[in-house]
């Protein structure tokens, strides 16, 4: 079900221990610490393998996440805003990652630009609660979605390359 490259990526992301969501005050602080450690490790791994593709930050409470992700196609870098909220039932419920500027541009997306992850990602996530976290959602959810959808959207002319400083169309 998971290819060798994905398996290698996954095995290099630390698994999380604490089963806590935003409602579990003290435990949530511990979970956030684990989330950041896993994200830092994942970004370091990506940089060392020359496959750096996103930046994320969160609000103070760690319940709203936002940043940028990018996809390189034919040597052009396509950059998108990425955002998601941590569900109150997290980690039992995976975050719904959104790329707002692509809202309505592909069938594999829900209202608000939330990417469709139901078929492949959600069952894998539910089997791995609480071990999977935000880094895993990026690696198993957003990364493959970008790899499939962005080249298709570029081919169809739905997504166009923007020079630095240009605004979205």
UniProtKB/Swiss-Prot annotation:
The active site is at 116 (glycyl thioester intermediate). The keyword Ribosomal protein does not apply. One of its GO terms (biological process) is protein K69-linked ufmylation. GO terms for molecular function: UFM1 conjugating enzyme activity. One of its GO terms (cellular component) is cytoplasm. Keywords: Ubl conjugation pathway. The keyword Membrane does not apply. It comes from the Eukaryota. InterPro entries: UBQ-conjugating_enzyme/RWD (IPR016135), Ufc1 (IPR014806). Belongs to the ubiquitin-conjugating enzyme family. UFC1 subfamily. E2-like enzyme which forms an intermediate with UFM1 via a thioester linkage. This is Ubiquitin-fold modifier-conjugating enzyme 1. It comes from Aedes aegypti (Yellowfever mosquito).
């Amino acid at each position: 079900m998971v290819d060798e490259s994905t398996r290698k990526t996954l095995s290099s992301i630390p698994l999380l221990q604490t089963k806590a969501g935003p409602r579990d005050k003290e435990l949530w602080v511990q979970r956030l610490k684990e989330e950041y450690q896993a994200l830092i490790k994942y970004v370091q791994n990506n940089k060392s393998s020359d496959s750096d593709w996103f930046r994320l930050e969160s609000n103070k409470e760690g319940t709203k996440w936002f940043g940028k992700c990018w996809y390189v196609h034919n040597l052009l870098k396509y950059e998108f805003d990425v955002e998601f909220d941590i569900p109150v039932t997290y980690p039992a419920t995976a975050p719904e990652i959104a790329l707002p500027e692509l809202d309505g541009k592909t069938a594999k997306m829900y209202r608000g630009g939330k990417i469709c992850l139901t078929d492949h990602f959600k069952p894998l996530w539910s089997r791995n609660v609480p071990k999977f976290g935000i880094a895993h959602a990026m690696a198993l959810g957003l990364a493959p979605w970008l790899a499939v959808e962005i080249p298709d959207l570029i081919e169809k002319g739905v997504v166009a390359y923007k020079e630095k400083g240009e605004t979205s169309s």
